[in-house]
């Protein structure tokens, strides 16, 4: 009976019947096959990444500026070390 129904259906319906209803599955499971040949779910898109660095000139100058460098002995060493190396920019 299935063979008879398959022969009566058109080519598009027959290909859908051969897929075993795969076109009815959720779209997330129709990903590319993984190393074992199994379909993998698509990656969730809810979480954003890579936006941790939001530059602020005030914070940059306060942390790495000339006044902050000269206010501590370690900062003076940083300036002298950069002078010795020949850096054009000694601080921010």
Swiss-Prot record:
According to the record's subunit comment, the protein's assembly and interactions are: Component of the mitochondrial ribosome large subunit (39S) which comprises a 16S rRNA and about 50 distinct proteins.
Which residue windows does the record flag with biased composition (Polar residues)? 40-57
Where Phosphoserine occurs, the residues are: 71
Q: Lipoprotein: present as a keyword of the record?
A: no
Name the protein family: Belongs to the bacterial ribosomal protein bL34 family.
Identify the keywords attached in UniProt to this record, alphabetized. Mitochondrion, Phosphoprotein, Ribonucleoprotein, Ribosomal protein, Transit peptide
Q: What is this protein called?
A: Large ribosomal subunit protein bL34m
Q: Where is this region: Disordered?
A: 40-63
**Cellular component annotations (GO), alphabetically ordered:** mitochondrial large ribosomal subunit
Which residues constitute the organelle targeting sequence? Answer: 1-46
Organism encoding this protein: Macaca fascicularis (Crab-eating macaque)
InterPro entries hit by this protein: Ribosomal_bL34 (IPR000271)
Superkingdom of the organism of origin = Eukaryota
Q: Which GO terms describe its molecular function?
A: structural constituent of ribosome
Q: Which GO terms describe its biological process?
A: translation
UniProt cross-references to Pfam families, sorted A to Z: Ribosomal_L34 (PF00468)
Instruction: Name where it's found.
Output: Mitochondrion
């Amino acid at each position: 009976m299935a063979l008879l129904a398959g022969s009566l259906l058109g080519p598009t319906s027959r290909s859908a019947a051969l897929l075993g209803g795969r076109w009815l599955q959720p779209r997330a499971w129709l990903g590319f096959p993984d190393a074992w040949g199994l379909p993998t779910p698509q990656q969730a898109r809810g979480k954003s990444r890579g936006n941790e660095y939001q530059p602020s000139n005030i914070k940059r100058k306060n942390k790495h500026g000339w006044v902050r460098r000269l206010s501590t002995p370690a900062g003076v060493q940083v300036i002298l070390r950069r002078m010795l190396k020949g850096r054009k920019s000694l601080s921010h």
